[in-house]
Amino acid sequence: MKDFIKINRAIDAKTLKEVQKNIEIRRKQGMYPDCFKYPLTLQFELTGQCNLACKHCYNRSGDADRDTLMTPDKWCDLARQIVSDGGIFQCIISGGEPLLLGDRLFDIMDILHEDGTSFVVITNGYLLTPEKVKRFSKYRFYWFQISIDGVTPEVHDEFRGVKGSWERAVKGAIEISNAGIPLVIAHTVTPQNIAQVEDMVELSFRLGASRIILGEVLPSGRAISNEDIILNHDEKNCLYGKIQELQMKYQNKIDIKRSGELSFQMKRYSIENNAGGIIRPNGEFRLDCMAPFIIGNVLKTPLKEMWLTHGINAWKSEEVQNFINSIDDDKQEGSIKNHIDKDILV
């Protein structure tokens, strides 16, 4: 078998060089600024609560509530502050499980929606109902992401810890697709389900998804205690080869993407201007899901002040660069255990 891992890493390396070159060209042409004076995109981790108990959860959602200090009222206050500062192009809604906020979720989204913000929603789909989907249909979406981790209820439900979760996710996906909202399926590939990858692509296509993201489990959060769900080298190589095959087979039917390797993602963020980050349930502003660094807390410091003081050049800091350089490509982890070790203030 070909070394598909090596091939994909070569493609990633070439992509990084092209991104760097394009940025330099656009800067010389005056088409790319030295920095962004305000985030273009923000991810709202609205709650640390979750109604499932997924083995791979990167941020350990549901573990003792994960310090949810940002109440719905505080999220609304933050949204108003963002609008007052000039607004953002994109808001990613996640958690935990964001639909646990009930009607208050829509209160938060309404504030940004009225200012022209478009959304990505990331959910396990369990709480989706026709009524909720109807309410979602008024917003502008880049996409609406539902996680389905098996072609059968048995595989998905065992992985996500709640019986009946597969059926609810599938029904929710159908409702989203039928409402004309762009549906993306996120599928975590493990040794237990890797043989059904093609079946999963077919299911996603039949559900009406425009894209499926096939990602391996990264050693972060709860996954660190569940090493049996992490692909070994041969399984990962097989997955990469299968993705290439399926991209050809399903061309013009459904977009099939693999999640990028950790070092590639981190290096790309370092090359580009910092364009955003994550507001966590405790108010901390985190650089990325997989980057264990914070620049402050919105409950203590205004977002704009924090961004201008620490956010713009955060990816260039010595601590972050040392972490990126420590990443082992085969193990997909660096010197800091993500969502296990304490995040570092930069």
Language model segments and positions:
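Radical SAM enzyme [4Fe-4S]-AdoMet core and its adjacent flexible, acidic
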Residues: 2-5, 66, 142, 149, ...
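Phosphate-coordinating loops and pocket residues in cytosolic domains that bind phosphorylated ligands
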Residues: 59, 130, 138, 158-161, ...
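Residues within well-ordered alpha-helical secondary structure of globular protein domains
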Residues: 81, 111-114, 203-206, 245, ...
